Amino acid sequence: MKVFINPGHHPGIDSGAVNPTYGTKECDVVKEAGEMLADYLTNAGCEVKIMQDDNLDMVCATSNEWGADLFISLHCNACNGHNARGTETWYKSFNGQRLANYIQSQIIRSTNTIDRGVKQSDGLW
């Protein structure tokens, strides 16, 4: 299986969400998570390609040209409110729902965060 991983945002262009207290940048967190995921999937026998860039047209084209069976984009949400906590996993197509449920359950079990659920959107890349 060929898995394409896109850690969202690029440090030199748009770092994504930034923690106002600690300065932690989304681009750094998802890059590290993407590299960990790539190692895990490679050890499980998958072919993995990882690309961190803000140009989603190029990222998606590269994934399609490579012939990826699966496209995973990693992000960390942020908001101004202090009550928002937890993890959610999004998927686009019906075929992605099963994987999204599995990913969500593994994250919740591993990190003990609040489960915000699995959500579907047709507006995803």
Regions from the language model: what does each represent?
Residues M1-G23:
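Short glycine-rich His-centered loop
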Residues T24-W125:
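Active-site-proximal helix/loop segments of hydrolytic enzymes
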